Amino acid sequence: MTQEVPRRLEPSPFEWKGDAGPSVKTLRPHAIPSVAIDLASVTKSYGDKPVVDGLSFTVAAGECFGLLGPNGAGKSTITRMILGMTTPATGVITVLGVPVPSRARLARMGIGVVPQFDNLDSEFTVRENLLVFGRYFRMSTREIEAVIPSLLEFARLENKVDARVSDLSGGMKRRLTLARALINDPQLLILDEPTTGLDPHARHLIWERLRSLLARGKTILLTTHIMEEAERLCDRLCVLEAGRKIAEGRPHVLIDEKIGCQVIEIYGGNPHELSALVSPHARHVEVSGETVFCYALDPEQVRVQLDGCAGVRFLQRPPNLEDVFLRLTGRELKD
């Protein structure tokens, strides 16, 4: 007996207006282009405030491309424009080979979205959530039921198929949201802060699942504030500030170009006195609160200087993407 699809209580951004229209099989782009996303000189303002300012970048098919930036940098607006939910003031956007927003409906049939906050139907079961979402792509109940086992296996939720979403852990909900985004076998995944709020075990499982999708040829556009996540997953990334691109490249290349030396974090003592002490042996020194960040040209000489300072602790480490991000955007809080 065919299971009845439950009624969803809230509208979906993928819900069509008017007639039923064609199914996902007939509406999605047929050919897989070599460039999944192309933005050319895109601008967008809200009132007198520009939020995206002459932005251009391309995302190649099969790569993970990261959008990094502080709050207010324009990441959410860029994502909405790529989905055709916000119209740019100027510039050209092409997604999966079709122009957006003029043919956003067609582009969205090849896109899966994992939003920052889970919008699952908590009163429905895992299976029911997938059944409901598949209908937004005009998939039949039989088609959806056919892919549910593989999606749940991918998300490691095989034994939760009939569990209510309200009974799932935070990590399970995120994995279900990822599985739901794959219901239409999309060419492109847009992930907004996919592991925010998860414990390390759940976060690493999501990363492992995302790497498996990249190995299968999926394209990922990732926005995140977790620099380790971007460094681990992204083939290339773009750093934004105030709607402008301030850096673009491969994570390890940006680390070499922008930092290029060992970092010594110094704690205790007077930070300004410590900064003056190590500056002769440093490429760059930053003070943030009670911590001194020394980008050391000669780490051994820095350690020699610090060894004579009572009560001072320090940690020497390789540079990372967080160092690049903070160097480019500053250490002050941005709301």
Swiss-Prot record:
Q: Where is the composition biased (Basic and acidic residues)?
A: 1-10
Please tell me one Gene Ontology term that the record gives under cellular component.
Answer: plasma membrane
Question: What are the binding positions for ATP in this chain?
Answer: G69, P70, N71, G72, A73, G74, K75, S76
Instruction: Give the Gene Ontology MF terms in alphabetical order.
Output: ATP binding; ATP hydrolysis activity; transmembrane transporter activity
Q: Where does this protein come from, organism-wise?
A: Rhizobium meliloti
Q: Name one Pfam family in it.
A: ABC_tran
Q: Where is this region: Disordered?
A: 1-22
Q: How does it sit in the membrane?
A: Peripheral membrane protein
| Signal sequence region | none
Q: What does this protein do?
A: Part of the ABC transporter complex NodIJ involved in the export of the nodulation factors (Nod factors), the bacterial signal molecules that induce symbiosis and subsequent nodulation induction. Nod factors are LCO (lipo-chitin oligosaccharide), a modified beta-1,4-linked N-acetylglucosamine oligosaccharide. This subunit is responsible for energy coupling to the transport system.
Q: What is this protein called in UniProt?
A: Nod factor export ATP-binding protein I
Under the heading PROSITE patterns, the entry gives:
ABC_TRANSPORTER_1, ABC_TRANSPORTER_2, NODI
> Residue limits of the ABC transporter domain?
37-267
Entry similarity comment: Belongs to the ABC transporter superfamily. Lipooligosaccharide exporter (TC 3.A.1.102) family.
Q: Where in the cell is it found?
A: Cell inner membrane
> What Gene3D superfamilies does this protein's entry cite?
P-loop containing nucleotide triphosphate hydrolases (3.40.50.300)
Predominant localisation class: membrane
Arranged from A to Z, the UniProt key words for this protein are: ATP-binding, Cell inner membrane, Cell membrane, Membrane, Nodulation, Nucleotide-binding, Plasmid, Translocase, Transport
> Might you give the EC number(s) for this enzyme?
7.6.2.-
How this chain assembles, per its entry, is: The complex is composed of two ATP-binding proteins (NodI) and two transmembrane proteins (NodJ).
